[in-house]
Each structure stands twice: as C-alpha cells, then as structure tokens.
C-alpha cells in the first residue's frame, strides 16, 4: 500500500508517506480557510487508478481563495509550492509541464467541484 499525505501551502500539495486506510477514490472538501477535510490517503496496490474529487465548500471565488489538489513526492513539495505561486492562477498554481507534478486538479472557487484520475 502507498499513502498520500496532504501538505498545505496556498494550494493542496500532497506526497507519498506511510499507511492509514485504503481506497481508490477520495472525496476532499476545502473551504475559505485552507483546511482540507482529508488529512491523508492510503491507496491499495490493487487500485488501477486513483480518483480525487475536490469540492470547495467556501464562498469566495477562485481568483480570491481558489484551491486545487496537487500530488508530488515529499522532496518536491516546498519547491513546487513556491514555484506554483509564481505560475499563478492561469496555470493552476503549478509550473506548466513540470514532471514533479504527478497529478493536479484545476483551481476552483466557492461552490465548485473538480476531480482528477491518475494511475
């Protein structure tokens, strides 16, 4: 099993770490205060793909308090968060074409939802 743990900067950046509970699909909620509802994710090796469904439960628009969900290795979290801020909203706060980004959702505002499926 692999586990994905969420690390928050201004975007949700996650990385692989130790084990918790297992699943192949995850529902994650985040509001206007950057508090993600799912602190960690454990993925069974048998999962052919993983889906993350992100829902913004707040009221502020994406250009004010937008959120996305990003998967990367632990070692890349800080650099991606910093470089992502420079990339801006137009690039979903991730450097375009960056191989360190393993999966990413689009940035969403209050009341919106998005998802990403990856393997």
Language-model regions: role of each:
Residues 23-49:
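N-terminal edge beta-strand
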Residues 40-63, 70-71, 114-119:
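Beta-strand cores of secreted/periplasmic/IMS beta-sandwich domains, seen most often
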Residues 8-16:
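Bacterial N-terminal signal peptides
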Residues 1-8:
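Bacterial N-terminal signal peptides that target proteins for export
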Residues 34-38, 60-64, 78-80:
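Short, solvent-exposed loop/turn elements at domain surfaces
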Residues 16-22:
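Sec/Tat signal peptide C-region and signal peptidase I cleavage site
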Residues 66-99:
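The feature marks short-to-medium sequence segments in extracytoplasmic or secretory-pathway proteins
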Residues 35, 97-119:
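Extracellular/periplasmic metallocenter environments
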């Amino acid at each position: 099993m692999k586990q994905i743990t969420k690390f928050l900067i201004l975007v949700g950046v996650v990385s692989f770490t130790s084990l918790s509970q297992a699943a192949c699909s995850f529902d994650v909620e985040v509001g206007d205060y950057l508090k993600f509802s799912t602190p960690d994710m454990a993925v069974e090796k048998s999962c052919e793909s993983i889906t993350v469904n992100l829902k913004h439960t707040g009221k502020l628009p994406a250009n004010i308090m937008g959120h996305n969900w990003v998967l990367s290795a632990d070692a890349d979290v800080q650099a991606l968060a910093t470089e992502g801020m420079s990339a801006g909203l137009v690039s979903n706060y991730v450097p375009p074409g960056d191989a360190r980004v393993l999966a990413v959702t689009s940035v969403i505002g209050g009341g919106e939802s998005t998802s990403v499926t990856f393997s």
